[in-house]
Amino acid sequence: MTIQHKQDLAQIRAMVPEMRRVKSIHFIGIGGAGMSGIAEVLLNEGYQITGSDIAENAVTERLAQKGAKVYIGHQATNVAEASVVVVSTAINEANPEVKAAREARIPVVRRAEMLAELMRFRHGIAVAGTHGKTTTTALVTQIYSEAGLDPTFVNGGLVKSAGTNARLGSSRILIAEADESDASFLHLQPMVCIVTNIEADHMDTYGGDFETLKQTFIDFLHNLPFYGQAIVCIDDPVIRELIPRISRQVITYGFSEDADVRIENYHQEGQQGKFTVVRKDCEALDITLNIPGRHNALNAAAAIAVATEDEIGDDAILAAMIGTQGTGRRFEHLGEFETGNGNVMLVDDYGHHPTEVDVTIHAARNGWQDKRLVMIFQPHRYSRTRDLYDDFANVLEQVDVLVMLDVYAAGEKAIAGADSRSLCRTIRSRGKIDPIFVADTQQLPEVLANILQEGDLLLAQGAGDIGKVARQLAALELNISNMKAK
């Protein structure tokens, strides 16, 4: 440890006490975005970090380079030296490392519990909602960084301007994505909460009851202290319905006339969104946002609302908006390539819920109106495909050409009628487009070689391993001869 690092740690310890009797922290599923972010912050705070995952990836390699001990595969001996074990949502009690920790009476905590511990002595800003969490977290982080406040942040995806999804800052500010998928965000006790929207998703967690999901968001907001602030999107009909039940200070944002922070005159020019933000008791801001789509204008308005309440200068806000590079796999431009059939633009996007796919399609249409939209879609989870089947069909038939990959199961068993072939048949029967089903991604290059044309926008869409597929296509530069050879 360098002298500078020791001095930095001493400064942090003056603000944030260390966890007593905790020396070594073990993460099961350390390669995931949410887990790795917390692990990286704790590693930089001086704790010994170990972790395990089923396979190596860029995240595990980066953590290993920073000094973490990463095991590939799960086995009981991995937790032998741990003071505490942190588990991701995907890890159950049958995991051999969890069983070994229980037998050795080593505390086992969920990811959100450890995040709550990081937040306990800091000024926490938590970003929740069904969609837009990762981008909003990144935008808040960028504003505070531009203002010289050096925040700690833990995000669910890569903050491209920082080159990482988490970083330990020198101030008391912690900006974090809050995960509602398993209701674990109820562990958090922030000073400021953003809620971007509320839709029916992860319903198995909530017993299939949307009212339970809504009440859980209310409970999350009521974790705020009485002087805390709830920043919520009034355009969302569910949030508008819930506002009277929120017993904390509420600040609203959106395109709606009655929003406290209001977006006006939105238009899109290619990759950039341009609009005016009107704020109460402050000058209006003319924003150039370096990521496309009305949905991202909403994400930006949420970040601007938080920054305005914290009295951050307009110069920092404007610089963050124009300077943002976005987040990994959120309408990520991977390049423009000469395919042999013509020039094609390749974009990768993580959206996997019908609402997310819909706003991505609209962003593509608005920014590149002259391009044919070719989508490679990989459904994520059979349960989501079943629950939102008609919504998926309605959204996906909007593209010009649809290539459908098999469902990315994410550990689920197949559900009859909720598979990609069925979804293709349903869309085909409506008569707008004729989807192409590709059972094996190895066949994808040849399929694309036969359908891509000059000027196409090729959009890889989904939350499974399609991001890896998109990068493989980019590595081949979408060249027809290269892809056929592959």
UniProtKB/Swiss-Prot annotation:
GO CC, alphabetical: cytoplasm
Annotated keywords: ATP-binding, Cell cycle, Cell division, Cell shape, Cell wall biogenesis/degradation, Cytoplasm, Ligase, Nucleotide-binding, Peptidoglycan synthesis
Domain of life per record: Bacteria
Membrane spanning residue stretches: none
Catalytic activity: UDP-N-acetyl-alpha-D-muramate + L-alanine + ATP = UDP-N-acetyl-alpha-D-muramoyl-L-alanine + ADP + phosphate + H(+)
Residues bound to ATP: 129-135
SUPFAM superfamilies in alphabetical order: MurCD N-terminal domain (SSF51984), MurD-like peptide ligases, catalytic domain (SSF53623), MurD-like peptide ligases, peptide-binding domain (SSF53244)
HAMAP family assigned: MurC
Protein name: UDP-N-acetylmuramate--L-alanine ligase
Organism, as annotated: Vibrio vulnificus (strain YJ016)
Originating gene: murC
